Amino acid sequence: HHLLEDAWCWLLRFNQGITSVGLMLDQTRPQKIAGPSNESTWQERVGLYPSLARLLEDVTMVDPPGRLLHAARVQRLCTQAAGAHWAMLPHTAGFIDPLHSTGIAHTLSGVERLAMILEHHWESDQRGDILQGYHEMVMQELSMIDRLVYGCYRTLDDFPRFVSYSMLYFVAVIGYEQNRLDPTQPSHQAAFLGADNPAWSRTVDKILQRLETGLHGARNCWQEATKFEAEVWEALK
């Protein structure tokens, strides 16, 4: 990932010599370059960052698609992730942003959970209630991803605070993976990124609120960023 002032750029190299390149723009910020999303606009935006421009100066477009693709708002959320006789995988029920690359892991956690439901409750009278519980957990997980991503977008132009806030995601991932390795914990019952843990959810909300307060009121940016870092580490102990 390359962090820019109002966006971030991904470069994903595949093993056949093709690299996927894209920009995710923060639409809540004033854009340095406005107008239609065509090749000239892309070149102008990339040209704002010399190191990025050098990386891309000799690239050629592959076919398909053979052209730049543009999408409007990417976030989506269904009101219901499961019902009495059906269920969506998490990535189908909602999508926030690719910043933390949560899509595959989140989907696999849903596959595992649904497989256990089908194995143990296929003919159970409780299946509807259990699927409702699945829905509620998926909504909690998407809310957690949303909060973890949102704080990072708020600090795109403030790298020290971006680093500090990003620690929330890594702590959540490590906690989730450690829980899966614990033989005493049923792995399929654990919510992705600890989303069903009230204490963890309160910690994320507290740090996010502290971030917003600092961004609105700080006069000494570096002093405030250092203070915020210390508060994040203290909250994560």
List PLM regions with ranges.
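Active-site substrate-recognition segment that forms the wall
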Residues: 1-28, 81, 88-90
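Non-transmembrane, interaction-prone segments in cytosolic or luminal domains
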Residues: 4-9, 16, 39-56, 96, ...
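Short, low-complexity intrinsically disordered segments
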Residues: 6-8, 40, 84, 198, ...
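FAD/FMN-dependent oxidoreductases across multiple families
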Residues: 7, 29-149
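Alpha-helix initiation/capping motif
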Residues: 26, 37-38, 49, 158, ...
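C-terminal helical "tail/cap" subdomain of flavin- and related membrane-associated enzymes
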Residues: 117-237
